[in-house]
Every structure is written in C-alpha cells, then in structure tokens.
Amino acid sequence: MNGFSFTVLSYPSQQLWSLNKITSLTTPSWRELIEVARWAPTIHNLQPHQVKIISDNEAELFYNPERLLPVEDPESIFTTIALGVFIEHLSIAAGPFGYKVIIDRIHNPVSTQSTKTTLFATLRLISTLEKEEINKSLIFERRTSRTDYNGESLNKNTIQRMEKEARKFGHDFFYSENKEIVDFVIKLNEETLFEDLTSKPTRDELDKLFRYSKKEAKNYKDGLWTKCMGFSGALTKSIFKNYKRWTKGFRKKLLKKYYMSTFKGTSTICWFAGQFNNSEDWIKCGRMFARNWLIMTDENAYIHPFGSLITNVNANNKIVSRLTNPDNSKKIWMIFRAGYSKIPIRSFRLSTNQIIIKV
C-alpha cells in the first residue's frame, strides 16, 4: 500500500526567512536538529524514530516497535529507509552550522519482533568544510501530493539534478513520459491497491493507522489522515468498517472511478534502482531519497510514491519486466509519479519532546 522553537512549530511558513541567515559555526544542539528533522516523511507517517542524546556530538537512534508494520513491511525494509530519510534530514538541518550527521554504527536490523524501544544506530555530529547544497527550509515545504496534477511533465533541470544526486549514492534515476508507461503504472497501482485490500490482516493494520477526522489526526499526530489521502473520512471509514459492501456492484465502480480521478494530469513516472540487500543499503536508499525529494521541492514539484508496486509480489514482477533497469545487480525499489499540483495538505507530526528519549 501505498518535522524549531514552538513559534516555528506553530507558524513554520512565517519562519522560513530566518533559516537561511544562520552563519554561526557553533555546534547546533540535537534538539534543534530534531525540531527540523521531525518533518521528514516516513512510511504511512508512522514516525518510528526516537533519539537519545548522549553528548553534544553523539546521539543514539532508536525505533519504537509499536510504530512498525508487521503485515505490510514484515522485514521493516521501508521502515529502515525511513530512518535513513530522518538521518539525512538531521544532517541537512546541521548544514548551515558547518556540521553534518554521520552514522558511527548500525547495531542491529529493525525487527517487528522487538517488544521495546530498540537501539538501531549511533549517530555523530561532526564539523565539515563541505557546503550543504540543500536549504533546510525545504524540509518545511515538502509535501506528498495525492491529488490531480496539472499535466505538465517534470522539468528537465529537475531530472538532471535528480540523476546527479542519485549517482552520488550509487543509484540510478529513471523516468518516463510515455503515456503507455504512465497509464500502465497508474492502472497497476489501482489494481494492486484493491488486491491488497482483499487481505483482512492488511485492512486491519491500515484501519489502525487511518485518522478519519482532523480531531483524530491532531490528537495522534501520526498515521494516515484521510484529508491528506484525498478521501473523505466517512467514505474511508465505511470502506474499512464495511468492506464487503464495496467489493461489488455500483459501489465498487464508484470507488475505483473516484480513486482514478485523483491521478488526472499525471504525465511523468519516476523510479530509482540501487543496491537493496541489507540495512546499510536501505539507509543509503533513504538518505538519497530524502535529498532528491527535497530537490523536487526546490523545483516546486510534488511526488506520490507507489509503495505497493514494490511490496506486492505480483505487481513487482510486472514492474521489473516493464520498466528500464539495465544493471541487474540493482533493484527497482521506489516508484512514484511526479509533477505539479495545488499545495497539498500538511500532515501532523510528533513533537520534539515525543521523539527525544529522556535520560
């Protein structure tokens, strides 16, 4: 299936101007970095990351097993990718201070069998002469757009920047504007979504993650707020609570027609391929993906990831046989549509205090 002081948290758009003016090379605090990085995207907005501050330049990254997906992500591959995204956001946030965040050690793979908050990696904050090219203000602007796009193809400059960034991590970036390919991917995504919904364990897992009203979304500050998904809360709740009613007849046709209408104007499909064998690979995927998503944000473009086309075996086999990937040693691990739309709704995030583990 398919993160600053309180003032910044409350009014991020009013604070962006100040973020570019940091010139001091004093060491930033971990709290400062987390206040920015908490806006990083995570799978289903679960935000499994927690941080224990050890010293000014060392922190431990933990994951909360209650924020994993035993059904949809049993090996926690995409959770690990999300941890990589979070780490890169920490590093980008440190850039204006003349610092970056590196991984000192990965301790153990993320496991759905864990029963307590578990140590994943040790992080270090180090000074660097390298200039961070990505402006951290983009972290607050980034969104996922699941609505209709305006029909424009992804800008060539954006594509060139993404190709260059992917290569830095040993990954390949591909895209297609071929209508046949675009239609194939969108249709396959729709078929896979409805196939996944036939699984009761999948439906039950998702039902716990959906926030069917703004009140729920604001209270939990995590999960899938239906407004961000482009569906009404009442409709989505009906689908998950009364699933059989939506499996046949006019309701099924109506649901599919409505879902497909949200893909109008899609003209570019993109995908990444790279090494995808272990935690180190998945973290690298996340760090690269984080940077490229922010590059697209800098170019005023949005994306909508199609996670189910990777996690669903049948769909993935069709993707592998259809999409370009000349290097057999690399795996297509991320597919998404990219383009231009109205500014999407921002989902909520856990507070910095909820992420930091008190010692």
Each model region followed by its residue ranges:
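Acidic, surface-exposed loops and disordered segments
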Residues: 1-359
